[in-house]
Amino acid sequence: MKKNYRIAVLSGDGIGPEVMQEACKILNVLKKYFFLSLEIQKFNIGGIAIEREGVALPKTTLLGCENSDSILLGSVGGKKWDNLPVEQRPERAALLPLRKHFNLFSNLRPAKLYPELKCLSPLRSDIVKNGFDILCVRELTGGIYFGEPKGFVNKNNTKYAFDTEIYHEYEIIRIAHLAFKLARSRKKKVCSIDKSNVLQSSILWREVVESVSKKYPDVHLSHLYIDNAAMQIIKDPNQFDVLLCSNLFGDIISDECATITGSIGMLPSASFNEKNFGLYEPAGGSAPDIEGKNIANPIAQILSLSMLVRYGMNLNQIADKIDKAVNNVLKKGYRTSDISHDNNFLKTDEMGDLIVDSLINGE
């Protein structure tokens, strides 16, 4: 880690400021008790930036992010900006340009079900009795979402539309290397998801992944067609470690994995470029319906910070301690409203304080 690590904090909209406040408590612990030299700078993004600075992604925010080592993001968007043209809404005008500006080609979505929370999963109890821990590694800049040509045609009283799935070899190589490197620090298993029995792009995908795998003989590689993968995740999620996916398939599979954990309020995510610059954010949205009620689950934001510490700072032991602090609080039965089956639940700040105490005291 650098002597002085700079983090751009973008709280954003909805519950973003509330959950970010709890993550900032963890940052303060890292400075005071773990003696990390951290420089925290806060900037506007999303709807709040529109209100304060006139645009969803102000130049000051972009410059601040450029001068940082990592970005910690809350959430953007909400119903109050739905009256704006689509291209000016916070989600479109802030997140997409931010990801594009930093060439974030990969997205990591952990989907972990703690045994203590297995009752939340929609899957049968015998399937999730031991929990599961899956990491979805999704290619973020190629594939059918960005392939050209694409279009919508209304001609001779007939309508048709078309999209193009394109993958370049280098795009597959770099995402495959990332997946295998991540697997080395986990259970050393990569399952690559494709549709190579139908799609030419998937034939290349499988061919390239196989080639890259030879450089990681200690990691076991398997392949599944996307339809079978969707079934297997429901049937036995614990069989998986790292899932390597194209843009489209990763979009679908990561949401499926998130759903079977029972609460998206528990799930962090990270996106990287080739220089390992990262954007870390909760997998969920801005949840404007519970904004200001102090009932949002801050765990996804705190675990996003843990990912920043692990992958951005390369401080695995400290990240492990943050993860353990969250786990310890859950083991003791503490819950926020989204993961509680009764009215006996903690407020956002109370959950944050308990995790802070657990991190400081190691219990």
UniProtKB/Swiss-Prot annotation:
Pfam families membership: Iso_dh
Keywords assigned: Amino-acid biosynthesis, Branched-chain amino acid biosynthesis, Cytoplasm, Leucine biosynthesis, Magnesium, Manganese, Metal-binding, NAD, Oxidoreductase, Plasmid
Main location: cytoplasm
GO molecular function, one term: NAD binding
Documented EC number(s): 1.1.1.85
Cofactor(s) in the UniProt record: Mg(2+); Mn(2+)
Catalytic activity: (2R,3S)-3-isopropylmalate + NAD(+) = 4-methyl-2-oxopentanoate + CO2 + NADH
Site feature: Important for catalysis: 145, 195
Subcellular localization(s) per the UniProt record: Cytoplasm
Amino-acid positions noted as binding substrate in the UniProt annotation, renumbered to this chain: 99, 109, 138, 227
Entry binding sites for Mg(2+): 227, 251, 255
Cofactor detail note: Binds 1 Mg(2+) or Mn(2+) ion per subunit.
Residues holding NAD(+): 78-91, 285-297
InterPro entries named among the record's database cross-references: IsoCit/isopropylmalate_DH_CS (IPR019818), IsoPropMal-DH-like_dom (IPR024084), Isopropylmalate_DH (IPR004429)
GO cellular component: cytosol
GO biological process, one term: L-leucine biosynthetic process
Pathway membership, UniProt: Amino-acid biosynthesis; L-leucine biosynthesis; L-leucine from 3-methyl-2-oxobutanoate: step 3/4
Keyword Ubl conjugation in record: no
Stated family: Belongs to the isocitrate and isopropylmalate dehydrogenases family. LeuB type 1 subfamily.
Quaternary structure annotation from Swiss-Prot or TrEMBL: Homodimer.
Function: Catalyzes the oxidation of 3-carboxy-2-hydroxy-4-methylpentanoate (3-isopropylmalate) to 3-carboxy-4-methyl-2-oxopentanoate. The product decarboxylates to 4-methyl-2 oxopentanoate.
HAMAP family reported in the protein's UniProt record: LeuB_type1
Protein name per UniProt: 3-isopropylmalate dehydrogenase
Annotated organism of origin: Buchnera aphidicola subsp. Acyrthosiphon pisum (strain APS) (Acyrthosiphon pisum symbiotic bacterium)
Gene for this chain: leuB
